[in-house]
Every structure is written in C-alpha cells, then in structure tokens.
Amino acid sequence: MLQTMKTLTLIPARLGSTRLPNKPLADICGKPMIVHVADRAAAAKLGRTVIATDSEEIFKVVAAHGHEAIMTRGDHESGSDRIYEALAKLDPSGEIDAVVNVQGDLPTIDPDTIRRALLPLEDGPADIATLGVEITVEEEKTNPNVVKIVGSPLAGNRRLRALYFTRATAPYGEGPLYHHIGLYAYRRSALERFVKLGPSPLEKREKLEQLRALEAGMRIDVEIVKTVPLGVDTQADLDRARTFCSQAGTI
C-alpha cells in the first residue's frame, strides 16, 4: 500500500576530495556543481532540500544561489553520518519519516530518478531503498569500480531485494547484471540504526558502506531505472559533464 511519507532531501558536500580538489564548487556552464545537484534535487519535490556541509565556502555559495544549507561537523567518516547530524538538527521533534540522500557529485541526475528512489519505502517493507541499472557494456561487468547488485527480483523485475553488493562480477551464470547507483532513501529509524552500527567486516573488505545494513539484517530494496547518472570523481568526468552541458544548453 502506498504510504504518505514526510520526506527530507539531504545532499552531503565537503571539499576534501583527493582526486578532484574542491569538487563541489567545480564550475559547470557557469554554475557550481553542487548547485546543479541542488537544483535537480529540489525539482524532484521530495520535501525540503538541504545541503549538509562542513565548508563555510560551500554554505555561502549554495545560499547565494537560493538553496538552503546547514553546517555540520568536519570529522564525519561518511556522508551517512553527515546527513544524520543534519537530520537531527533540522528535525529534532522527529516529524520526518524518510530521508533521501543525494550524492553531491551527480550534476546530470534526472529529478524523476531521484523520485524513484523513494518508491520501495512508499509501497513496500524495505528499511532502505536505492537504485540500479542493468549493465549493457561488457567491460563494466568486470570493472571493480562498477558495484554490482546481487538480488532477488520483485514487482515484475522492476525491483530487486538486495542480498549482496560487490565489486566482483556477480552473480555467476546467465542473466542480467545490475550496476548500483549510490543514491539512497532511508526510513528515519533505519538511518538512526545504520549510523550507530559502525563499519562491518564485509563493508571494510569490499569498501561498500551499504553492506553494513545487510550484515545487520536490514532490508534494502533496489528500484531499477534506465540510465546511470554521470558521477563526477575525476577531471575526465568533470570534462564530460561540461561537454554534456554545453551540448544540451543546460544540464
């Protein structure tokens, strides 16, 4: 049954990227990347959209472009920890039911894709929801940077119940492989539990934070979408985002 959920969209952002310094403020067609992400997250209309950052520079830039930001501590080990602090500050009375965590390096993400991340929480029993795309490029099947989802099909193959996430090529045998998109929607209680657990053995081995939830018995459902949004981790990725923007006239 479809639930009516009070939702908060949070975008964690920090300046500490080693591969691409000052990444959130990188210019794409005259606008900082973090602002492109905020524009698209706001267009998804999943409640209030707030950037959670430890950088006063990011805070000021975001505010200058008309978006809301909140300062968080600088010692967080993950974006999940940062958004939990932001949630506690923004909603101390506990009125928010679900939190959508949009990564700050997805400047081309479709607002509809963001909306779809919430669906497994609205119409199913999942604790956490995320996104996946069927892999169609052969090289991606063996690329450890393309995280694969091992899961059981649900809802006519448009959704998976996640059993595992891995950098290896899995599952073995005939059939589709799915690329995990690191955008999450959490029930509030699930986020609270998740950040209190601490890193798990498989999480540390695979370097995949979502395995912490699975090892603790939490349910993650994956909504299957059609395209992978461009994630900006390197200068080459940034160049692609700029090319996309210049060709499209806008992101």
Swiss-Prot record:
Keyword Nucleotidyltransferase on entry: yes
Pathway: Nucleotide-sugar biosynthesis; CMP-3-deoxy-D-manno-octulosonate biosynthesis; CMP-3-deoxy-D-manno-octulosonate from 3-deoxy-D-manno-octulosonate and CTP: step 1/1; Bacterial outer membrane biogenesis; lipopolysaccharide biosynthesis
GO terms, biological process: CMP-keto-3-deoxy-D-manno-octulosonic acid biosynthetic process; lipopolysaccharide biosynthetic process
Principal subcellular localization: cytoplasm
Enzyme Commission number, as recorded: 2.7.7.38
Chemical reaction(s) catalysed: 3-deoxy-alpha-D-manno-oct-2-ulosonate + CTP = CMP-3-deoxy-beta-D-manno-octulosonate + diphosphate
Keyword annotations from UniProtKB, A to Z: Cytoplasm, Lipopolysaccharide biosynthesis, Nucleotidyltransferase, Transferase
UniProt feature coiled coil, ranges: none
Subcellular compartments: Cytoplasm
Keyword check for Transferase: yes
GO cellular component: cytosol
GO MF term list: 3-deoxy-manno-octulosonate cytidylyltransferase activity
Domain of life from the UniProt record: Bacteria
Broad EC category: transferase
Purpose: Activates KDO (a required 8-carbon sugar) for incorporation into bacterial lipopolysaccharide in Gram-negative bacteria.
Designated name of the protein: 3-deoxy-manno-octulosonate cytidylyltransferase
Species of the source: Brucella abortus (strain 2308)
Gene: kdsB
